């Protein structure tokens, strides 16, 4: 996994052989990791964090090379910021690994237990998923975050970093593997794909001959769409975060203003940022104008329906496309709706099943919204930007999942496990 061995392109046969070998090693490592006691995993993660700190000069040197290449390719400033590492950011990466080590062990928990009339004692026990493939773009810190979460849950990780961050990711992955090996755990439990060749992504999506159990994409819409379309293994992901704030007729105006400002503007570029504001017509006369004014005064562009345009000349007309747009910027779409039913219909028509919020003092209305909106995270009287594994107390997350199978919402260490049934008998046979 040496940085010096990274190649921009390799022959198709070479990539195929490389990926098969990575998959084989990951599967073997996953079998060992599944049996590692909690204390040993935690010690290994702390050793990995220490190795990252010790390797900081090497990591920063690799990152400088990545940044120089990215600037030469005229990549956007936002991409450069996500790619850039500093001594402080490297320390934050190491601290995040230590925080994951401090989480409760998700493996070996008894999830259920019962006894059958014939005397069979049955228990459901949490177990690792196996091998987790993570495909991500420009953030080098995902290497450590995703790797540590997978390892904490007793899994092996196969990591495919974006081409722009490959040197940085390789240096971080090598440090983590060194930390594992120092504690007697398999270094192959965290493997970075050491090539920029896109055929490697295709091999991962095909499952590496049955060696990958689940794929997690971290990146832009085009990456996630490709993974969801082409993967032959389960995917934990969300395509978009078209998140809504619905201000109900019985919403406290001061609360609604604070929640909306935070939901939209705390960080506009994250998947939990609100992209659409819905205002109940019953309170629009008192609530709509101040809500819109707050956004505009904070530098947020507002695209609204006719009623929203009427309250402020700075509002531009919303189109049908606006209701379906994840802006990831200081832009929001605003619509006045005819009550709770219309709000739920709008969210179900245009939403992405990520995170949606209602602001109201009416508990019955809140319960209906929470029950009927089919999103991974539904919120009452709080910001949509709490859609985060850390805020949920998960310590960290590998992503947000909006599917209906297995993981949904923030994917932390618990969601990176499955379960098995243990059946204890005393000689029973089935009649």
Swiss-Prot record:
<dbReference type="InterPro" id="IPR012134">
    <property type="entry name" value="Glu-5-SA_DH"/>
</dbReference>
<dbReference type="InterPro" id="IPR000965">
    <property type="entry name" value="GPR_dom"/>
</dbReference>
<comment type="function">
    <text>Catalyzes the NADPH-dependent reduction of L-glutamate 5-phosphate into L-glutamate 5-semialdehyde and phosphate. The product spontaneously undergoes cyclization to form 1-pyrroline-5-carboxylate.</text>
</comment>
<keyword id="KW-0028">Amino-acid biosynthesis</keyword>
<keyword id="KW-0521">NADP</keyword>
<keyword id="KW-0560">Oxidoreductase</keyword>
<dbReference type="InterPro" id="IPR016163">
    <property type="entry name" value="Ald_DH_C"/>
</dbReference>
<comment type="similarity">
    <text>Belongs to the gamma-glutamyl phosphate reductase family.</text>
</comment>
<dbReference type="GO" id="GO:0050661">
    <property type="term" value="F:NADP binding"/>
</dbReference>
<keyword id="KW-0963">Cytoplasm</keyword>
<dbReference type="GO" id="GO:0005737">
    <property type="term" value="C:cytoplasm"/>
</dbReference>
<comment type="pathway">
    <text>Amino-acid biosynthesis; L-proline biosynthesis; L-glutamate 5-semialdehyde from L-glutamate: step 2/2.</text>
</comment>
<keyword id="KW-0641">Proline biosynthesis</keyword>
<dbReference type="InterPro" id="IPR016162">
    <property type="entry name" value="Ald_DH_N"/>
</dbReference>
<dbReference type="GO" id="GO:0004350">
    <property type="term" value="F:glutamate-5-semialdehyde dehydrogenase activity"/>
</dbReference>
<protein>
    <recommendedName>
        <fullName>Gamma-glutamyl phosphate reductase</fullName>
        <ecNumber>1.2.1.41</ecNumber>
    </recommendedName>
</protein>
<dbReference type="InterPro" id="IPR016161">
    <property type="entry name" value="Ald_DH/histidinol_DH"/>
</dbReference>
<dbReference type="InterPro" id="IPR015590">
    <property type="entry name" value="Aldehyde_DH_dom"/>
</dbReference>
<dbReference type="Pfam" id="PF00171">
    <property type="entry name" value="Aldedh"/>
</dbReference>
<dbReference type="GO" id="GO:0055129">
    <property type="term" value="P:L-proline biosynthetic process"/>
</dbReference>
